[in-house]
């Protein structure tokens, strides 16, 4: 295995050089390393550091006693950065024997023998055998087969990545139903649909083990969904989390969307805005997908660490923090296309909605998306007025 040395943050590792004649080199290498996920890993360092500070303020723990596991480590870059840049004990696991050997080599390169260890086990077996304060599930594809074990092992925070956005977002409907036990819809807000389906699956898995979960930070970036969830033991927390579950109604004729809370509820088929037949997605998470206070703590950690993607990360976290807690965003371009209207600047639209007496905000999902409590008819009136 021919390798090269790369640096992320303050961590130096050896990674395999993939063949030059393949479409997606990272997946063709003997051990997976994707440089495009450095932004994800930078945010992970900041979010984990922020949570560790919370954990140490609440529990009688020393920093070196906090235990983190990366269940799918590959080169070990994610777990090594946590050990070296956050300063907690990191377990890096991978079933691939070449990955296992490379992780051990990279531990030595960084002098982290006292703070890090490599294991070679099936991820579900490891997570059923041991408990960790922070469990990180970042597989190649869907995390669904590992959520039960992850919910069992997580004693403080569960961090989850999903790259199977087509099933999550409704593009591959049956696959999404099989993996997440939820019906997604492929709408203009499909990225948020995927996030809420994933959060709903996590909430249900935690509840099975009499645990609740509270989303601290979630974002959809490029081809993946990423969430950081505080895991809270006890039936009270489990029941409270399930109260944020429900269904989303969508009218393909007029664009109406609305939440219906509850796992066993009566849902009218007719759109309350235009009377047409609606489509239903769920069950999914309808509560907030981030905690503004935690977002501020992550922003502080981003400033404190030397990171290559710092400015991009800060922009994502700031947008997440400032979004309204109203499920399912609108896309200005989709509405403009329906109306035959010209799009205006997104900030101009936000201000016009606020001037009309409504709440409104941008979102991190796209540059043309926004949230508002305005009825769909009022949104269209305002967009038409701005279009002239």
Swiss-Prot record:
Residues 4-383 form the Trm1 methyltransferase domain. Zn(2+) binds at residues 251, 254, 271, 274. One of its GO terms (molecular function) is tRNA binding. Pfam families: TRM (PF02005). Transmembrane segments: none annotated. It catalyses: guanosine(26) in tRNA + 2 S-adenosyl-L-methionine = N(2)-dimethylguanosine(26) in tRNA + 2 S-adenosyl-L-homocysteine + 2 H(+). One of its GO terms (biological process) is tRNA N2-guanine methylation. This is tRNA (guanine(26)-N(2))-dimethyltransferase. The lineage of its organism: Archaea, Methanobacteriati, Methanobacteriota, Stenosarchaea group, Methanomicrobia.
């Amino acid at each position: 295995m021919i390798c090269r040395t790369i640096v992320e943050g303050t961590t130096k590792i050896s990674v395999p050089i993939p063949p030059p004649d393949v479409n997606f080199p990272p997946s063709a290498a003997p051990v997976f390393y994707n440089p495009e996920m450095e932004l994800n890993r930078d945010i992970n360092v900041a979010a984990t550091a922020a949570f560790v500070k919370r954990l140490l303020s609440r529990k009688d723990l020393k920093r070196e006693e906090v235990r983190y596991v990366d269940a799918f480590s590959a080169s070990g870059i994610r777990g090594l950065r946590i050990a070296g840049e956050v300063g907690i004990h990191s377990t890096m696991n991978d079933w691939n024997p070449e990955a296992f050997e490379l992780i051990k080599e990279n531990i030595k390169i960084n002098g982290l023998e006292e703070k890090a260890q490599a294991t070679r086990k099936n991820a579900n077996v490891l997570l059923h055998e041991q408990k960790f304060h922070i469990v990180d599930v970042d597989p190649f594809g869907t995390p669904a087969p590992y959520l039960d074990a992850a919910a069992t092992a997580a004693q403080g925070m569960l961090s989850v990545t999903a790259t199977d956005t087509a099933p999550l977002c409704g593009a591959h409907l049956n696959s999404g139903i099989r993996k997440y036990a939820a019906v997604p819809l492929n709408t203009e807000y499909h990225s948020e649909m995927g996030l809420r389906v994933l959060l709903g699956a996590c909430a249900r898995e935690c509840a099975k083990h009499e645990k609740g979960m509270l989303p601290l930070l979630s974002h959809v970036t490029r081809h993946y969904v990423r969430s950081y969830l505080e895991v809270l033991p006890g039936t009270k927390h489990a029941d409270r989390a399930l109260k944020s579950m429900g269904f989303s109604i969508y009218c393909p004729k007029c664009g109406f969307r609305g939440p219906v809370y509850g796992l066993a509820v009566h849902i009218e088929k007719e759109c309350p805005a235009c009377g047409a037949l609606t489509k239903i997605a769920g069950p999914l998470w309808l509560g907030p997908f981030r905690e503004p206070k935690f977002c501020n703590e992550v922003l502080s950690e981003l400033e404190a660490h030397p990171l290559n993607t710092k400015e991009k990360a800060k922009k994502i976290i700031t947008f997440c923090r400032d979004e309204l807690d109203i499920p399912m965003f609108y896309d200005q371009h989709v509405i403009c296309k329906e109306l035959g209207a010209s799009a205006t600047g997104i900030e101009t639209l936000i201000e016009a909605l606020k001037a009309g007496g409504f709440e409104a905000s941008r979102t991190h999902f796209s540059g043309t998306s926004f949230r508002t409590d305005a009825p769909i008819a009022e949104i269209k009136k305002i967009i038409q007025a701005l279009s002239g």
